[in-house]
UniProtKB/Swiss-Prot annotation:
Region (Disordered): 1-78
Protein name as catalogued: Uncharacterized protein C1B3.20
Compositional bias of kind Basic and acidic residues: 10-33, 63-78
Superkingdom: Eukaryota
Organism: Schizosaccharomyces pombe (strain 972 / ATCC 24843)
Gene Ontology CC terms: cytosol; nucleus
Amino acid sequence: MSSNSNTDHSTGDNRSKSEKQTDLRNALRETESHGMPPLRGPAGFPVNPRPFSHGGNANLDRLNLKEPVDLEGPKDEQ
């Protein structure tokens, strides 16, 4: 009785290790893009793709501006 060394007998999955890892990475990306809690990043720290959930910019927030600033600059009116 021969068996494939890649076969995971619990699932019958006989893809190579790298194929399985690629699938896992894709599934992780998919999960995170749907707002599920992320797992851990490369250094073991939590990964947060959207650090400012209010949609602001940290540097602009820190300035505590009293009125909006025109970030586009002056427009040439014709």
